[in-house]
Amino acid sequence: MTAPRWLASLACLALAPSSSALAQIAAPPVAPRPMAPAALTSQLQALGSGFNGRVGIAVQSVDGGWRTGWRADELYPQQSVSKFFVALTAMDAVDRGRVRLTDPVTLTRGDLTLFNQPIAQRVLGNGSYTTTVEQLLISAITKSDNTANDKLMRVVGGPGEVRRVIADKRLGAIRFYDGERALQSRIAGLTWSQSYSIGDAFYKARNALPMSLRRSLFNRYIDDPYDGASPYAIVDTLARLKRGELLSPSSTARLLTIMGNTQTGKNRLRGGLRPGWTLSHKTGTGQVLGGVQAGYNDIGIITAPDGRSYAVAVMIKKTSTPLIVRMNLMNNVVRAVIDQHNARFAGNLSL
C-alpha cells in the first residue's frame, strides 16, 4: 500500500535539518582575536590598578587586531567624547547625501547651551550667526563647543539619529543621551531652561538645589552613566574608522584630519607622543562636585612614523586626584603603546 503524500512529506521534514541547525552548520568559525603583547598588558594593568580613581584603559592595534586594557568592559561617562559620535553621524549623513558639509546653518539665541560654547560670542553679538555644517563639526571636535555640537546633532536628525547610527554600525556598548543641555541638566538635577544659557544662570540654579539631591544624582550618574561607553567599544570603533569600515574614504580622511587638529587636552594623550607620532583624538570633561569629577577622558588614534596605528582610550569615571596625575596616567599609557611598538618593529619595517 502506498503511503499518503502528507506522510511522505512529514518524513522528509523530519529528516531535514532545522533552519537553526542549517545556520549553525553554515556559520563560519569566528577567528580568535590575536594575543596582545604581554608586556603591554602588564603595563596597562599596573597603570590602571595604581591610579587613585575608577579608570578604564583600552588599546587596540588597528593593523594587528589585538586589544588589551584595564577594566575596559565597564561603562564610563563619555561627556564630550560623545561629540565624536555626533561627528560620525554627520559624516555618515554626508555619505548618504542627506546633508553637505557646505550647507549653511544659522544659530540663534535659542541654540545656545552652557559651559564651553565659544560660538556663543558670535551669536550674542549679532542675535544670530550663519556658518556651515563643516564649521559646526570642526568647532564641536577641535574646541569641544557644546552649542556647535548640539546644533550639528539637530541638523543631522537629532539624538535618535545618532543612536541609530551607533546601532546600525554595531558599535557596541555605547550610549548616547539627548545633547549637552539635557545631559548636563540631568546630572545637576535640573530641567533645562533656555535662560541657563546666558552668563552664570546655570551655576546659580544648580547651587540652589539641596546638596543631598545633587550628590545623589551625581553618584547615580557615575554608577550608571546615561552617556556611558566602554573603552573597548570606543577603541573598536576608532579602529574600524581608521580602517575605512564606517565611512567613505573621503569622509574618513576628513574626520580624522579634524580630530588631528583638536585643541583641547594638549597634555592628555598628546603629552605622551614621541617625535614623529601623530594623534587624532577627542577629549571629555565632566562636572565636579565636592572635589570629585565625573568623567575625565581622552580617546584617539595614535600613528607611528611607519604608518601603523593604535586606538587608545583612557576614561576616568570618578576621581579627585590632581589634574597632573591624571594627565601623567594618559601620557604613560601612550608611552607604553609606543614602547611596545618600537620593541617589536624598530629596524624591521616588513613585519
Regions found by a protein language model. Name each.
Residues 19-23:
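Sec/Tat signal peptide C-region and signal peptidase I cleavage site
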Residues 77, 173-250:
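Active-site-proximal helix/loop microenvironment
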Residues 129, 190-198, 279-286:
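Carbohydrate-binding/catalytic loop surfaces
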Residues 1-5:
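Positively charged n-region of N-terminal signal peptides that target proteins for export
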Residues 25-189:
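Active-site-adjacent loops and short helices of periplasmic peptidoglycan-processing enzymes
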Residues 8-18:
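Bacterial N-terminal signal peptides
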Residues 12-13, 87, 142, 168, ...:
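Residues within well-ordered alpha-helical secondary structure of globular protein domains
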Residues 24-47, 154, 159, 219, ...:
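Structured C-terminal helix/loop/strand segments within mature extracytoplasmic catalytic/sensor domains
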